[in-house]
Amino acid sequence: QQQVRRQKIFLACSCLILTAGIGLFVTLHHNHQRAAAQEAELRKQIKQKQEAELQKQQELENNTIHFVAVGDNLIHQGIYESADTTQTVWNYDHLYEHIRDDISAADLAAVNEESIFVSDHANISSYPAFGSPVEIGDALVTAGFDIVEQANNHVFDKGITGITDTIRYWETSHPEVALLGIHDSAESAGEITTISCKDVTFSLLNYTTTVNNEPYDELPDYAVDLLRTDQVISDVKKAKEISDMT
């Protein structure tokens, strides 16, 4: 009887221990599942927050246009002589190497090119009447400029030939660049130059108040955009009709 009693007690204790063990296992398993679920939910929330922040930043970037404008780019003798002038083609990339990253990082970059260009190195000149090598223009494009403003007081330093040669250079060598301020015909002068960036179209206007190298007998009315109130009003009105911003 005592043996049977001890067996019953042992069996009861075993059942109790087994039940407790099962209960502990179930509790631990449940806690583990709950912790795993909480961790998964936390990771999900963090990911959603990161994605929302990334989307917000992307939307902000898509609706932000970074614009850089610099000048004057006026090429004196010491500057154009900084190239290896013993070569047939001169190189001026070094002039802009310290700003190239800033210029290239912008969505749009404009430069006021203060001097006119000449294709023949023999015609290069400095103060007071400037004529710069066309390779300066190549270096500007390499630096990342999209817009070149040519209307300024030195635009007539090489006469009408300098203006037309500069136009030909930009049109043939870098047609992707938006050229402003000078024209080779009345028809061209009547057109508004535009440029698009991130689904926004800009109208670009460029004027000069004065032109050196008087008298102006050789200078056609259409060749240079001069700052005249009536003309500016007319241009701005036309620009607003074809673009989002002027």
Predicted regions mapped to residue ranges:
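Acidic, metal/ion-coordinating pockets
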Residues: 7-246
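N-terminal targeting leaders characterized by basic, low-complexity, disordered sequences
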Residues: 1-2
